[in-house]
């Protein structure tokens, strides 16, 4: 779930392929195409986003202990360049966003807008 882990997995795959090739007396070659980099939040920005979300929906509705997921995102490139946090705005049950039957829950739009407005208010308070 990070670049070191990714490199370790690639090296391990190469070792397995080499071992199998040696066992069968053949030559083998692996090409690994790296996709998106891992999406890794900056801890302070993730905490900041959780605080803003708690302001909007209450801390009991904010889950900051989600298990890491293997998915990657183009936002990963932004997180490599700048501190930040990628989060998931819960929209209830149903298919995932990349599923062809995905149906956006319009009822969460005001909640999402309130969250993003709160992020701005916390980052740039009016004095």
Segments the model singles out, each with a brief description of its role:
Residues 1-127:
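Metal-dependent amide/peptide-bond hydrolase catalytic core
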């Amino acid at each position: 779930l990070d670049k070191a882990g990714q490199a370790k997995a690639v090296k391990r795959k190469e070792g397995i392929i080499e071992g199998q090739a040696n066992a069968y007396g053949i030559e083998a070659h692996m090409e690994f195409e790296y996709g998106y980099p891992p999406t890794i939040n900056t801890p302070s920005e993730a905490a900041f986003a959780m605080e803003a979300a708690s302001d909007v929906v209450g801390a009991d509705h904010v889950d900051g202990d989600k298990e890491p997921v293997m998915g990657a995102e183009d936002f990963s490139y932004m997180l490599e360049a700048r501190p930040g946090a990628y989060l998931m705005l819960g929209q209830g049950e149903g298919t995932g966003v990349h599923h062809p039957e995905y149906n956006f829950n319009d009822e969460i739009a005001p909640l999402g807008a309130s969250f993003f407005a709160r992020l701005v208010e916390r980052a740039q308070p009016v004095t």
